[in-house]
Amino acid sequence: MGKFVISKTKNGEYTFNLKAGNGEVILSASETYSSLDSCKNGVESVRKNSNSHVEDQTKEGFEQLTHPKFELYTDKAGQTRFRLKARNGENIGRSEGYKAKASALNGIASIGKNAPEADVVVEEE
C-alpha cells in the first residue's frame, strides 16, 4: 500500500510525496506549504482527485477536459510527464519524467490505486 510522506523543507515549509508500496515516488507536491495543516489539505486534495480523467496533451488536437484532471504532456527534454489539477484548476501534484508514455499512464493508474487509502507519515525534522 502507498503512503504520503510529508517533510519539512530547508526554508521551514512543508511538502509531500506520494510513494507506491515499493517506495517509488509517483507524485510530488507542486508547491510548498507554509503550515503542516495546509500541506495535509494538499494531500486530501490529491486523494479526492486521484481518479480524475486524463487529458492527453501529447496528441495533436487533443480534447480539452474539465477539471479535475491529469494533464499528460511532453516536456522540453522529450520526456512524458503529468500533473494533477484540482476542480479549481490549481496544480496540486506533478510527476517525474518518463521515457515512455505507457510508464506515465501506469503512474497515473498507480495514484488512483494508492492515494485514496494511503497512510500519511510526517517525517521528523
Protein language model regions, located:
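Intrinsic disorder/low-complexity detector
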Residues: 1, 47-76, 118-125
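A structural feature that tracks compact, well-ordered secondary-structure segments
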Residues: 3-7, 13-33, 42-45, 69-75, ...
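Negatively charged, low-complexity tracts enriched in Asp/Glu with abundant Ser/Thr
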Residues: 28-60
